[in-house]
Amino acid sequence: MSMSDPIADMLTRIRNAQMVEKVSVAMPSSKVKVAIAQVLKDEGYIDDFAVKAEGAKSELNIALKYYAGRPVIERLERVSKPGLRVYRGRNDIPQVMNGLGVAIVSTPKGVMTDRKARATGVGGEVICYVA
């Protein structure tokens, strides 16, 4: 059976792993998932990630980050879904928690944060909110 929303699956795996205080979480890899993991790492929400290739299939391993015994990621919410895509122009990209959180946006120039998209002057599909 094929997965209808691999990005939502990735976010759910991260949320579930953090609820049981796992050190890392593994999932099937894709270019978009790796790009999202890179943004999460750059913003300090995860420790690290690695892609392990086994023949035709590859696996993405994400090392989760905790501070004082609590997960660094408090909120991880999917915005644009397969049934309802959410696109925003460069002037309409939302701020998460008045700039304390991050919106991850897929733009023609790659996957980036809301701040970088505004600075670059591009809009795109709002993938998720992270806080």
Swiss-Prot record:
Name of the protein described by the UniProt record: Small ribosomal subunit protein uS8
Family label: Belongs to the universal ribosomal protein uS8 family.
Domain of life: Bacteria
UniProt xrefs under NCBIfam families: PRK00136.1 (NF001109)
Gene Ontology cellular component terms for the protein in this record: ribonucleoprotein complex; ribosome
Gene: rpsH
Keywords, ordered alphabetically: Ribonucleoprotein, Ribosomal protein, RNA-binding, rRNA-binding
A Pfam family it matches: Ribosomal_S8
HAMAP family, sorted: Ribosomal_uS8_B
Record lineage: Bacteria, Pseudomonadati, Pseudomonadota, Betaproteobacteria, Burkholderiales
PROSITE patterns: RIBOSOMAL_S8
